[in-house]
Swiss-Prot record:
GO cellular component: cytosol
Organism: Corynebacterium aurimucosum (strain ATCC 700975 / DSM 44827 / CIP 107346 / CN-1)
Predominant location: cytoplasm
UniProt cross-references to InterPro entries, sorted A to Z: RNaseH-like_sf (IPR012337), YqgF (IPR005227), YqgF/RNaseH-like_dom (IPR006641), YqgF/RNaseH-like_dom_sf (IPR037027)
HAMAP family, alphabetized: Nuclease_YqgF
Name of the molecule in the record: Putative pre-16S rRNA nuclease
Subcellular location: Cytoplasm
A GO term for molecular function: nuclease activity
CDD domains named among the record's database cross-references: YqgF
Domain of life: Bacteria
Function comment: Could be a nuclease involved in processing of the 5'-end of pre-16S rRNA.
């Protein structure tokens, strides 16, 4: 199941906050960026309610409310892939939620122009998020309640870093570094 993620910087909506989503079968982790689109921060974990054959439920409504609340100019939905880049079995869930958000935003008259909903490569984000939580001393029980938010932060931060590189030719970590001749 080969599914290609979107490329940052293409049709970029410009400055503003971005929302990042880690879609699971039980929960959806949510993260938001600062207005400069440099730093991702956790927001909340939304309980997943909408299935493939269901009408939109409270989870979709909550995600739309967050898009409006943060005035998001772009939404980055994690695209689960294995290390070879192939889509995992969870791809269908992420694509379904992205589709429903796009559809609802297109009909939403609260926004002049709906923000683009991007599919973002999320390889190893949950592994990285879990390791970071354990390293910071978060208990396994407490970790379950925030792991989806941490994964959403990883997804969004990777998108922000790649976006910055695509638009500026360097990563945010070396902003201000000078290239010195030998």
């Amino acid at each position: 199941m080969a599914v290609e993620p979107d490329k940052p910087g293409v049709d970029d909506p410009g400055p503003g906050r971005r929302l990042g989503l880690d879609v699971g079968t039980v929960r959806i982790g949510v993260a938001v960026s600062d207005r400069d689109a440099r730093l991702a921060m956790p927001v909340e974990t939304v309980r997943r309610e909408t299935g493939f054959k269901d009408r939109d439920k409270d989870d979709i409504d909550r995600l739309l409310d967050l898009i409006h609340e943060y005035d998001a100019v772009e939404v980055a939905v994690g695209l689960p892939r294995d290390l070879k880049g192939n889509g995992s079995s969870s791809v269908k869930h992420a694509k379904e939620i992205a589709f429903r958000i796009r559809r609802r935003l297109a009909k939403d008259d609260r926004m002049k122009e709906p923000p683009p909903v991007r599919m973002v490569d999320e390889r190893l984000t949950t592994v990285v998020a879990t390791s970071a939580l354990r390293a910071s001393g978060v208990s396994e029980k407490r970790g379950r309640s925030v792991i989806d938010q941490a994964a959403a932060v990883e997804i969004l931060q990777s998108w922000l870093d790649a976006r910055h590189f695509a638009l500026n030719g360097h990563s945010p970590s070396n902003v201000g570094d000078e290239v010195r001749e030998p």
